[in-house]
Design a protein with these regions (language model features):
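Cys-dependent protein tyrosine phosphatase-like superfamily
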Residues: 1-93, 105-137
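Short cysteine clusters
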Residues: 97
């Protein structure tokens, strides 16, 4: 996973670029309990499908959340609902898209007030472009 680093936004929320089914066991070993897909199938040739990743998650006992986004439909139609996914009572969430940028911007939009300001700062420390969240919030 060194070529596709995990960016730890909080103790419970991390983002990264495309995940492969072969990485799921390692993600579980790192304490992740939920994998959230923010990438539509077939965005790039050869990327694993959501069904393939869901099967790998099921095999290893992780929840798989489908919330695919493009820049055209960002942030999707259920930001309030997806906010709950970013606040697990136990375990950790890994959200992924092509680079981690959409996932990080989505997480930022689920935060409010001072927490949102802090979320911008955390994402920007990783070099994540936060323009999508800034334009909407």
């Amino acid at each position: 996973m060194a070529t596709n680093p995990i960016m730890h936004l909080t103790e419970k929320v991390s983002v990264m670029g495309q995940v492969s089914p072969e990485q799921i066991a390692a993600l579980k070993a790192e304490g992740f309990t939920t994998v959230m897909c923010n990438r539509p199938d077939h965005e790039d040739p050869g990327q694993p499908t959501m069904d393939e990743l869901a099967a790998a998650c099921e095999e290893h006992g992780l929840r798989f959340v489908r919330y695919p986004l493009t820049m055209m439909n960002f942030p999707g139609d259920d930001v309030a609902g997806i906010a709950e996914e970013f606040e697990p009572e136990t375990g950790k969430v890994l959200a992924y898209c092509r680079t981690g940028t959409r996932s990080a911007n989505l997480w930022i939009l689920t935060q409010a007030g001072d927490a949102r300001l802090a979320a911008f700062a955390v994402a920007e420390r990783y070099g994540i472009n936060t323009m999508s969240a800034r334009q909407l919030g």
